[in-house]
Every structure is written in C-alpha cells, then in structure tokens.
C-alpha cells in the first residue's frame, strides 16, 4: 500500500475555471487539513481525487501520484482511499439496512464480511447494540449515528488514506465531539493519511498536522499547523485564524 499520495497541478473547469493548479501531498500518519470558505474548491478537489466530479465539471490538467507513480483516481477509491462524506444521509441507500451496506462494502473490497467483523467495526465507533444497528435503515438513524456508521465503513475498508469532507457539519456539539474523538482514535490506531476538509479552525487545531488554505480555487497558503496559527501570511488565512481566536477572546498578533 502507498505511503504517500500527491495531487499535482489539479485544474478543474466547467463553464468557467473552478480549481487552478492545486497541489497537495498526503502522507501516512499525518492529517492535512484543507480549509477555506464555501465555494473555494475544497470539495471539488476531493471529488477529483476520487474520480467523482459532478456532471459538467472536467479535469483539464494535473495528475495524481501514489509513491511517485501516476495512478487513476478509480484505482484509489475505496481500496486506497476511504471516504467520510459531508452529508451521510445522502450516502446511504434508503432501501438497504446497515448490514447490507456494510457487507457489500466489505465484499466489494475483498474484505471479511462476517457478522463478527461488522459488529466489531460498529462497536469501534461507539454505536451501542450492534445487532440492532445492523438492522436499521438510514431513515431510522440520527445524523450523528449515520456519520459514525460512515466512519465504521472507513474502518472496514482498512484503507491507508481517508478523505473526511466536513465530517462534523450539521451535527450538534455533542455529536461533533464524538466524531472528532473517533477520527483521533483512527489516526492513533491505524495511522492513515487523512485529508480533512473543514471550515472549522477549532477542528484544524485539534486534529491537523499540516494545513492548506484555499480561496477562489487556489491554494493560497500551506504549512504546518503551528506555523499557520502563529504566523499566518495570506489575508484569507489571517481572517480564518483571527475569527477562531476571537471565540476565546484572543487576537492575532500583528
């Protein structure tokens, strides 16, 4: 399995340019946070990595490399990169139980799909009574439960990399804390490389090792998390850090 995945000069376009020459490097055991405002190109960059661009959007330049060798995004999805989606409710088939979702995921990847394996993954993400959870349909579960089920799927994939696209969006404070605890636990136990897409600098401060800031489809600043928080350079980065510090009655040093 690869130790590094590199996005090199990814350029996306629809009727107009959307993402301009984005380059990022994911490394096993490290969390790279991709931050920026709504519409900055974060989710599109993830979609390009997985080969799931929306209709009408095409990649006009760039490549993806695994350990320095060019690779198709279709060869990465699931096997080498697991995904935790922004809206878990839309990620599950409403006609299938959680047991069917989990089992089909394992079978598609050639992983063990016995009930003991599925139960262990569900228990690992803190969902109680795994036997009952496996019988539930998506509409019978809360947003927080579905998000934890998405993380259980990522655990089952055993992929060396994870893309987590706004994993705490639209969750209450308690559910958000549980999701962050789970992501932290996965990093400690499995040491994948993680691309964490978020607009929440509190999440960045807690989980990230490195940060890339996007604005208007471009990477405007990159660095390790400590440097970026202590000495942000770009105006967008300074605005994000300042807003985060203001929550604690603090100001960014001039």
Swiss-Prot record:
Broad class of the protein's primary localization: membrane
Compartmental location: Cell inner membrane
Gene3D superfamilies, sorted: P-loop containing nucleotide triphosphate hydrolases (3.40.50.300)
UniProt xrefs under InterPro entries: AAA+_ATPase, ABC_Ni/Peptide_Import, ABC_transporter-like_ATP-bd, ABC_transporter-like_CS, Nickel_NikD, P-loop_NTPase
Key words, A-Z: ATP-binding, Cell inner membrane, Cell membrane, Ion transport, Membrane, Nickel, Nickel transport, Nucleotide-binding, Translocase, Transport
Described purpose of this protein according to its UniProt entry: Part of the ABC transporter complex NikABCDE involved in nickel import. Responsible for energy coupling to the transport system.
Name used for this protein in its record: Nickel import ATP-binding protein NikD
């Amino acid at each position: 399995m690869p130790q590094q995945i590199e996005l090199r000069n990814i350029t996306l376009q629809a009727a107009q340019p959307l993402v301009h020459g984005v380059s990022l490097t994911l490394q096993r055991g490290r969390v790279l946070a991709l931050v920026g405002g709504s519409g900055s190109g974060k989710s599109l960059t993830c979609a390009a990595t997985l080969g799931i661009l929306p209709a009408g959007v095409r990649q006009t330049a760039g490549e993806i490399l695994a350990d320095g060798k060019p690779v198709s995004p279709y060869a990465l999805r699931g096997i080498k990169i697991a995904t935790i989606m922004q809206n878990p409710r839309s990620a599950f088939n409403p006609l299938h139980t959680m047991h069917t979702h989990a089992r089909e995921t394992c079978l598609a990847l050639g992983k063990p799909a016995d009930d003991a394996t599925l139960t262990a993954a569900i228990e690992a993400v803190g969902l109680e009574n795994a036997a009952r959870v496996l019988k539930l349909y998506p509409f019978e579960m809360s947003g927080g439960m579905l998000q934890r089920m998405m993380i259980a799927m990522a655990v089952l994939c055993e992929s060396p990399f994870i893309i987590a696209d706004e994993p705490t969006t639209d969750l209450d404070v308690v559910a958000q804390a549980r999701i962050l605890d789970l992501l932290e636990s996965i990093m400690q136990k499995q040491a994948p490389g993680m691309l964490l897409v978020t607009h929440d600098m509190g999440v960045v401060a807690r989980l990230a090792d490195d940060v890339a800031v996007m604005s208007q489809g471009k990477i405007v600043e990159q660095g390790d998390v400590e440097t970026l928080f202590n000495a942000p350079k770009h105006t967008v980065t300074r605005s994000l850090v300042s807003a985060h510090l203001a929550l604690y009655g603090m100001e960014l040093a001039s």
